[in-house]
Amino acid sequence: MIKAVMMMNTQGKPRLAKFYDYLPVEKQQELIRGVFSVLCSRPENVSNFLEIESLFGPDSRLVYKHYATLYFVLVFDGSENELAMLDLIQVLVETLDKCFSNVCELDIVFNYSKMHAVLDEIVFGGQVLETSSAEVMKAVEEISKLEAASNSISLVPKSVSGWRGR
């Protein structure tokens, strides 16, 4: 099971953090700080896989990938394959690149609802749902269409809404 998905910049600011087990906000912040301190102290020429039992408990592992100014991090238990989790980060990044045409930190900050939609199509409740970037894109585009359609529907007749503006 996946325990957490995090995206943070190289200064340690979390840009997206999703925990699949309930944790109080203070504990989440403590874990994010702990993960960042581990990541920023690692040289570039070492493995992207870590045992992280000291932070997340027994049988916890972490895999990360560093792209430009962002760390993409997955924390998971022993039931998940480490290479599959690394590939899942790649799927997430490829999908985000398709959504935002070369994703950057600002895309994550200003499009958080779309970010969560993409992540929820890939991982939900700590379980991997989809590993195809194309399928995730189809689902996200459908969600965007439905949101656009629901935004264009007005529940208040124009005659009444015109009256409210006076």
UniProtKB/Swiss-Prot annotation:
GO cellular component: AP-3 adaptor complex; cytoplasmic vesicle membrane; Golgi apparatus
Record keyword tRNA processing present: no
Membrane topology recorded in Swiss-Prot or TrEMBL: Peripheral membrane protein
Subcellular location: Cytoplasm; Golgi apparatus; Cytoplasmic vesicle membrane
Keywords on record: Cytoplasm, Cytoplasmic vesicle, Golgi apparatus, Membrane, Protein transport, Transport
Biological process, per Gene Ontology: Golgi to vacuole transport; intracellular protein transport
Pfam family, one: Clat_adaptor_s
Role this protein plays: Part of the AP-3 complex, an adaptor-related complex which seems to be clathrin-associated. The complex is associated with the Golgi region as well as more peripheral structures. It facilitates the budding of vesicles from the Golgi membrane and may be directly involved in trafficking to the vacuole. It also function in maintaining the identity of lytic vacuoles and in regulating the transition between storage and lytic vacuoles.
PANTHER family: ADAPTOR COMPLEXES SMALL SUBUNIT FAMILY
Oligomeric form and interacting partners: Adaptor protein complex 3 (AP-3) is a heterotetramer composed of two large adaptins (delta-type subunit and beta-type subunit), a medium adaptin (mu-type subunit) and a small adaptin (sigma-type subunit).
Protein name: AP-3 complex subunit sigma
Organism of origin: Arabidopsis thaliana (Mouse-ear cress)
Organism phylogeny: Eukaryota, Viridiplantae, Streptophyta, Embryophyta, Tracheophyta
